[in-house]
Amino acid sequence: MRLAFGIVSLFPGGGLQRDCIEIARLVQAKGHEVTIYTCRLRDAGLADEIPVLVLQNDAKTNHQRQHTFALDFRRRTADRYDLIVGFDKLLELDVLYCADPSIAYRLKNRPYLYLLSRYRTFRKLERNSFARNGSVNIIFLSENQVIEYQSAWRTDFHRMSVIPPTLASDRKRPESRTDKIRKRVRTGLDLADDDWVWLSIGVQLRTKGIDRAVAALIEFPNARLLIAGLSDTNRASIKLAKHAQHLGVSSRITWLGHREDIHHLMAAADLLVHPARYDTTGTVILEGIVNGLPVITTAACGYARHVEAANAGSVLKEPFRFSLFVAALRRASDPSLRRAWSLSGAAYGADPTLYQGRVRAADLIVEAGFSKAARANIARSNTKESQACK
């Protein structure tokens, strides 16, 4: 089969981007041809042996960019491929790999947002895949998504599949928490032996709740916060960096920018602090667990259930209360409790199903291609029979 994958932005470090590339490789390894289409490519060598075609897109806003890309992708792929797969909400897809929350679900309680063109545009794209009696096969990353989309659109259950976690097995390196490696990494980050080190990871600072972690530093004078994903000079982080300065905690924050050595950062840290307002999955949560790093997170994250299942930290119930967040952090300041959480998390990481999500997604995509081909053959056969009877 020849398959086209569409994703608006392709850049290093993004979870959706890693999923797109790795699933493309898995499908290709099954003997099929895959071409990735995008309109924003930050690293030309990112996909290695997978062909990547960049469609010019001069839109100035995110919603205009996605809508323009959806139109261009549909035009460029029509009748040229056996299966069309979207990693963003696009148009006339065969399969959608959905990593986003439902716009329509959020608009139900905030109808005034319809006044904004961005929400109208995103809802229109969402409807194309999720409206009842549609034909798009949808791959979800968490059960939370099924509840949202079904509530908003009454999407047919037979079109929806939920895959296991998409954590790559090579991200599991609990052996990195040995004293030797831990000390070396902490020294390189200018961390003292008695510093209580929090790690937060993400590029969407407010969505991931990193502003909440910054605010909590006031309550813990011996805590240091490492923020991986953005530098303090990035446009998205300047506002929070200034706020940290206003709070008097900026000297205890280290902005690390984009990092590929996350397992080393997790070895150096004492706690993963991920008080997100929303996270479809929160793969970093699971990554922390299997690497023996205790986790403080919120129930708004799809993978928060793994924290409780592994007994590897604390999950804050919704709605979020800052006082309970501080209380959870205070409880996590106990080294013996963190040690127990660390051992439980590393043991939980031995479960092989935690690393099978991308394989399952590739299987579902290939199955969808074969099903589409079978339906087309039946339709052609019926047409020939009908013509023969005339």
Residue ranges and their predicted role:
Residues 237-257:
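Nucleotide-activated donor-binding/catalytic signature segment of Leloir-type glycosyltransferases, i.e.
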Residues 258, 277:
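Aromatic "clamp/platform" in nucleotide-sugar-dependent glycosyltransferases that forms part
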Residues 39-41, 167, 201, 224-239:
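Glycosyltransferase donor-sugar binding loop
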Residues 18-22, 196-219, 235-238:
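A conserved mid-protein helix/loop that constitutes part of the nucleotide-sugar donor-binding site
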Residues 272-273, 284:
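A short hydrophobic beta-strand element within the catalytic core of glycosyltransferases
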Residues 119-141, 146-147, 153:
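Membrane-proximal helix-turn-helix segments that form the acceptor-binding/catalytic region
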Residues 294-298:
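Short hydrophobic beta-strand element within catalytic cores of glycosyltransferases
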